[in-house]
Amino acid sequence: MGKNEQKDPNVYFFVPNLIGFTRVFLVLISLYFMSWHPNYCTIVYLYSSLLDAFDGWAARKLHQATNFGAILDMVTDRCATSCLLCFLCAAYPKYAIIFQLLVSLDLASHYMHMYSTLHQGASSHKTVTKKHNWMLRLYYGNNKVLFIFCAANEMFFVALYLLSFTPRTPPKLGYLPVPSFIYSTGELPLSYPTLLAVLCGPICLAKQIINVVQLVNAANALVKMDVEQRRAAKKLQ
């Protein structure tokens, strides 16, 4: 190797990717605690989610944005949320089909959106243009909006996770009588998880609407690409 030749950098050891690997490790730890220690699980899970904001910042700050890092980030998000929703299926069997649909919607919408944007020549699945729906432009075009929606979405599911455990001590605010289809015991504890669920629930619902819009937008883009390819093929015949 000549003196002027430089060795290719090891992308795996870029700072944003190391943060990504740390997130994966923390998610695995949270899964270990998930069924029997909600406090440990919640702390580790939320710490992993918090790091999601730092890997992107590090990538921009250190000029270490990579294709691998972008995919690692998205896959980690999808897998972590899916694992939590799988637990909620067992914790709330009456609503299992809802959580199953949420997992399916989350995976399908993000995969199809990524596939369509990259096939249209975009450098990232977060790249949106005027052709995209206004909701997607607002969602992906503003990092603060993206963070709020993603954080509230995760916090709502975490709140449901915490509520699935019987509190060791009675909540200071007492209990609220509710129908059994809302809470199995008929008495909803007025605790921090309850307040968190109430605050984050509407944003979580909006996030699911965005996922539907994202799915439809990606499907339309892929169909348009198919039509254009078939037209081009006919011209060559």
UniProtKB/Swiss-Prot annotation:
Stretches assigned to the Lumenal side: 34-41, 93-94, 166-185
Cofactor annotation comment: Divalent metal cations; Mn(2+) or Mg(2+).
Induction, as annotated: Expression is regulated by both growth phase and inositol. Expressed in the exponential phase of growth. Addition of inositol to inositol-starved cells results in an immediate increase in pis1 expression.
Subcellular location: Microsome membrane; Endoplasmic reticulum membrane; Golgi apparatus membrane; Mitochondrion outer membrane
InterPro entries assigned: CDP-OH_P_trans, CDP-OH_PTrfase_TM_dom, CDP_ALCOHOL_P_TRANSF_CS, CDP_diag_ino_3_P_euk
Domain of life from the UniProt record: Eukaryota
Alphabetical list of Pfam families matching this protein: CDP-OH_P_transf
Gene3D superfamilies tied to this protein: 1.20.120.1760
Binding site for Mg(2+) 1: 52, 55, 73
GO CC annotation terms, alphabetical: endoplasmic reticulum membrane; Golgi apparatus; Golgi membrane; membrane; mitochondrial outer membrane
Top-level EC class as recorded in UniProt: transferase
PROSITE patterns, per database record: CDP_ALCOHOL_P_TRANSF
Alphabetical UniProt keywords: Endoplasmic reticulum, Golgi apparatus, Lipid biosynthesis, Lipid metabolism, Magnesium, Membrane, Metal-binding, Microsome, Mitochondrion, Mitochondrion outer membrane, Phospholipid biosynthesis, Phospholipid metabolism, Transferase, Transmembrane, Transmembrane helix
Binding residues for a CDP-1,2-diacyl-sn-glycerol: 56, 60, 66
Catalytic activity: a CDP-1,2-diacyl-sn-glycerol + myo-inositol = a 1,2-diacyl-sn-glycero-3-phospho-(1D-myo-inositol) + CMP + H(+)
GO molecular function, one term: CDP-diacylglycerol-inositol 3-phosphatidyltransferase activity
Ribosomal protein recorded as keyword: no
Residue numbers binding Mg(2+) 2: 52, 73, 77
Topological domain spans for side Cytoplasmic: 1-12, 63-71, 116-144, 207-237
Active site, per annotation: 77 (proton acceptor)
Entry's EC annotation: 2.7.8.11
Protein name, entry field: CDP-diacylglycerol--inositol 3-phosphatidyltransferase
Gene name of the record: pis1
